[in-house]
């Protein structure tokens, strides 16, 4: 019994030592930008990181990931922890249903699917797949970011995010035929979709990025 206790103590010590090793953080460059608000100077050293298309920001993110995964990969119980979490998460999940037009919609995940699927059914018929985000891209990095139905539920506008980006694309389809309606809207960011009756909807978008420069101007549009 004492040997077992000593062995457990040794394992705990080794885990503690391995997880408390000094981390050599990548130093973030300071590029001061001064703004004046009501006579007060406000210094921002990291404004340059807001340019998410610049090579400098890309390099910064790369080095941050290097540091992070170097630490995570040396945790001895990481694989066991992942295995346990996957086991706990592997169960069917169904959201509360909601009514749009004649159909009842709900999201369902069979267990370990990357994204929940949007289903619908009519009366007591067998549910059918309406939107399956898992088929948006081969590598599974394109996600469903939002869904908004027109007032009569004849159309639905849904937004997608590629690679976890804040930028969105908005796609409109006919709910009965599932055929595309109009053009895909690009450069949507931090925006909800608000329908104006069944004529169209309002949304906010940024100007298309030019080179590595992003515009902070937000335009309001209505799509017909």
Task: Describe each PLM feature range.
Residues 19-224:
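Beta-propeller folds
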């Amino acid at each position: 019994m004492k040997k077992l206790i000593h062995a457990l103590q040794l394992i705990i010590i080794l885990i503690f030592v391995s997880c408390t090793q000094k981390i050599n953080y990548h130093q973030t460059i300071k590029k001061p930008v001064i703004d004046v608000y009501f006579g007060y100077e406000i210094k921002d050293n990291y404004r340059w990181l807001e340019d998410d298309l610049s090579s400098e920001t890309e390099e910064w993110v790369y080095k941050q990931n290097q540091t992070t995964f170097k630490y995570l990969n040396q945790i001895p119980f990481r694989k066991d922890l992942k295995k346990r979490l996957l086991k706990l998460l592997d169960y069917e999940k169904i959201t509360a249903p909601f009514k749009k037009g004649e159909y009842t919609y709900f999201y369902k995940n069979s267990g370990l699917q990357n994204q929940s699927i949007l289903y619908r059914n009519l009366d007591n018929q067998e549910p059918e797949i309406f939107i399956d985000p898992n088929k948006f891209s081969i590598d599974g990095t394109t996600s469903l970011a939002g869904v908004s139905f027109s007032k009569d539920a004849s159309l639905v506008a849904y937004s997608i995010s590629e690679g976890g980006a804040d930028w969105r694309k908005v796609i409109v389809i006919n709910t009965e035929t599932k055929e595309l309606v109009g053009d895909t809207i690009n450069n949507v960011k931090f925006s909800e979709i608000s329908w104006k009756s069944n004529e169209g909807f309002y949304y906010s978008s940024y100007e298309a990025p030019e080179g590595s420069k992003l515009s902070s101007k937000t335009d309001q549009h209505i799509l017909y």
